[in-house]
Every structure is written in C-alpha cells, then in structure tokens.
C-alpha cells in the first residue's frame, strides 16, 4: 500500500503557524513581485479567489473581507517542508518527496487493518510537531493514493486520513472523479479524452487497453492500470533527477534596457547551473524567453524564446551564462517593456555519462574544481557570495511588500514569546 501526504493550502498554512490569529480568516500568498495568487486558504477560496488571480483584481475583496495577504517567503516554506518530511520519516519505513508540499509514503508490509488509524496518527503528529494540517490518502497505488488524499481534503469527517482499497469503494469514487483531476492526465490528453466522452476516471478505466495504448502510449496505459489497483509507479527513496530546470522571475516594473534584462538572465543562468550541479547532471540545451506584461493591454505586446546548445553537455556556469546571453541577444527588441524573463535547461543527462570531445578547448577538470569551490563557498557563507560578474553584485530586486519573517531560518527574525 502507498500513502500520499498532502499539506493543506501549504503556503497559507505556513503563514498561519506563526500568526494563529489568522485562523478562520481568508489568507492568500502572492507570487514573486506580488503579481498573482499562488496559494489560498479555504476561506479565500470561498470568496471566489482563483489560483493565478492577479493581485490588483482582488484588492477590493481584500478590504471588504479583511484578507491577510503575504508575499511569497520561500525560505520559510522550504524549511517548514523539511520539518514535515523529517516528521514523516520517523513514522513510516520511507518517504519520497514529490514536491514542496507532497510526499509519498511506503506503507508496504503494514497490515491493512492498521492503515487508517496509522494515517490519522500521522496527520495528528505532523500537525502537532509542525503546525501544518495534512491530508493522508492511502491506496494500493500512487495514483489512487493521490485521489484518496483529495477526498480527505474535501471531507473533514475523515479526520485527516482516507483509506481506499476495496474494489467497490474504488469504483464508487472513480465514477464521480473528474478525469481532468487524475494524476498523470496532461492537458493534451485531457482534451482528447473529453472529446471522446471520457468524463470521469471510471469512464477512463472502462476503455479497452488497446484504445488507451493507441492514443496515450505507455504513460497513459500506466495510469489506466494504476486506477485499477495495479502498482506501476515504483517508490523512489531518492528523488529522480529533474529533466528540466527552469528559473524565472517577474520584474517589479517593466524593463526596457537590454543591460538590465541581461543582468537578470545571467543571474537566472547561474542559479539554474547550481541546481544542475546539485543533482550531478549536465544539460544539452539552454532556452531563454522574455515577455511583456499581458495585463497591460494598452502597451505593445511581445513574447519570444530562443534555444541554443553548448558544444558538449555542461553544468559550467562560465559556459551557461554566455550561452544565455547569446540567446537573449537574438530575441531582445527595443521599444517594449519587459515584465518577465526566464531560462530553462533541458536535454539533461547524468554527469557520469559524459562523452568528451577530443578537440574540446575547455579544461573541464579545472572548471569542475572551480565550480565545486564556488558552490562550497556559497553554501558556507550564503548565496551569491561568489558570482560571475555578468550577473552584477546587487541582489535581484523584487517587490515584496507583504513579506513575513523568516521565523525558522534567521536568528534575527526568530519569533519573540512574551509571558506575564
């Protein structure tokens, strides 16, 4: 059996842990530069606030309903996530981190009769140890466990855990579960399935195996089998290497000068390269994109991207930053105000499988030692202590007017408790 621990409204819940007076009050968390909503409490959802809702469109609601608004505080959220995972790993044989607010639990070998109470015990313990409310879904496969965790969120009477393993119970749930909410059903397949009158997960599993394989390939067939209780997605104690690494930011205001955008893109390339090295990988493609503010329809609109390739796959910041600059030069156009830029590293492979080029002019062993030294220095003394000159020395400016304290990672911002 597999479990799925899903933190409820995670970013909003993190803010509430240190502000208990916000319990019962609408809470939203905004994206970088306070652009749009990326997390909502249940009270905020009830007001009709959507994911991705531009902040300026909800300011009237904010005043009328006393919404607590927060800028994204990823240092806090990352640390709270680590605390949740640490707690989980003390109670189950293994936990696989799936995202910042989700983890799969290995429950194989535990008696079925104990699972529901174990799930509730996990939910209570995580809440007590971290302050974060979680929903535990338990089922024979990862895909069904994801569905069970969604049910747990919808029905408070389940008391933090939903066990779903009997065929009749699974059928009852799948008959009502929308196909677009099934884990593993992407946007392209979603449209195709709906056009074929596949509205629910039950409609999906009733289709013949050949029909699924012909239209959705091996990935779709795996989901089809998982929904029928056949485990096809292995448990991974260590997270797999990412196949794409993206770093992007919205700017606090529109940028018009190439030099300003170049500095930001260089910083993005440096951050992406560090993430690449952290997972012991190399990339064979670098894509840079820039776009204007789509919410300012009165302004000229422009979006473009460009992909370039290194001579050989690399994780070297000193190669990736110039490649990103080359891509940016090809797509930058004067006369536009750019609101966002980003970089994506793709065609990712393992560092151990590198095929060297006999005529490669780069001393890769020397550069690898340099990158290791730079990463070690930044880990020890703080991010961006050592940087490439192209990214400048000033930190990236972001508009974060509603930023909370870093209660758990900065001694200067640690919470103060007063007692009479």
What are these regions (language model features)?
Residues 10, 33-36, 293-296, 348-352:
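Short, charged/polar surface micro-motifs in flexible loops or helix N-caps
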Residues 1-225, 234-235, 364-420:
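Gly/Gly-Pro- and Ser/Thr-rich, intrinsically disordered tail segments characteristic of DNA damage-repair
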Residues 103-108, 304-311, 354-360:
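Short, hydrophobic beta-strand segments
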Residues 189-337, 353, 419:
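DNA-contacting surface of Y-family translesion DNA polymerases
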Residues 325-380:
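C-terminal hydrophobic structural anchor segments
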Residues 111-115, 297, 349-356:
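Short, charged/polar, Gly/Pro-enriched secondary-structure boundary elements
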Residues 98-102, 139-142, 281-285, 336-340:
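Short Gly/Ser/Thr- and Asp/Glu-enriched loop/turn motifs at secondary-structure junctions
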């Amino acid at each position: 059996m597999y479990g799925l621990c899903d933190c409820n409204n995670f970013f909003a819940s993190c803010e509430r842990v240190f502000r208990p007076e916000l319990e019962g009050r609408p809470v939203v968390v905004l994206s970088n530069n306070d652009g749009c909503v990326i997390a909502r409490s249940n009270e905020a959802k009830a007001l009709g606030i959507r994911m991705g809702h531009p902040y300026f469109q909800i300011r009237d609601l904010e005043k009328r309903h006393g919404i607590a608004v927060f800028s994204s505080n990823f240092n806090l959220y990352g640390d709270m996530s680590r605390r949740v995972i640490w707690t989980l790993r003390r109670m189950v044989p293994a936990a696989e981190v799936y995202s910042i607010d989700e983890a799969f639990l290995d429950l194989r070998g535990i008696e079925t009769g104990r699972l529901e109470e174990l799930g509730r015990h996990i939910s209570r313990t995580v809440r007590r140890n971290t302050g974060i409310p979680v929903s535990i879904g338990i089922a024979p496969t990862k895909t069904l466990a994801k569905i069970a965790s969604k049910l747990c969120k919808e029905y408070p009477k389940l008391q933090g855990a939903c066990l779903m393993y009997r065929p009749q119970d699974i059928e009852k749930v799948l008959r009502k579960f929308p196909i677009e909410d099934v884990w593993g059903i992407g946007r392209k397949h979603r449209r195709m399935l709906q056009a074929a009158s596949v509205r629910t997960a039950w409609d999906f599993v009733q289709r013949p195996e050949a029909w699924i394989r012909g239209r959705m390939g091996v990935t779709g067939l795996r989901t089809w089998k998982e929904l029928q209780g056949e485990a096809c997605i292995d448990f991974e104690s260590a997270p797999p290497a990412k196949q794409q690494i993206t770093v992007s930011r919205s700017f606090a205001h529109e940028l018009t000068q190439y030099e300003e955008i170049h500095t930001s893109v260089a910083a993005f390339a440096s951050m992406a390269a560090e993430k690449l090295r952290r997972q012991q990988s190399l990339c064979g493609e670098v894509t840079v994109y820039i776009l204007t503010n789509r919410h300012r329809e009165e302004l000229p609109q422009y979006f473009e991207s460009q992909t370039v390739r290194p001579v050989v796959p690399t994780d070297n910041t000193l190669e990736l930053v110039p490649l990103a600059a080359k891509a940016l030069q090809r797509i930058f156009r004067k006369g536009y105000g750019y609101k966002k830029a980003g970089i994506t590293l793709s065609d990712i492979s393992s560092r151990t499988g590198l095929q060297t080029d006999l005529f490669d002019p780069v001393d890769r062993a020397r550069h690898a030692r340099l990158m290791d030294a730079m990463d070690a220095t930044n880990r020890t003394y703080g991010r961006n202590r050592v940087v490439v000159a192209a990214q400048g020395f000033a930190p990236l400016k972001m508009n974060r007017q509603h930023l909370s304290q870093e209660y758990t990672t900065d001694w200067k911002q640690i919470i103060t408790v007063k007692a009479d």
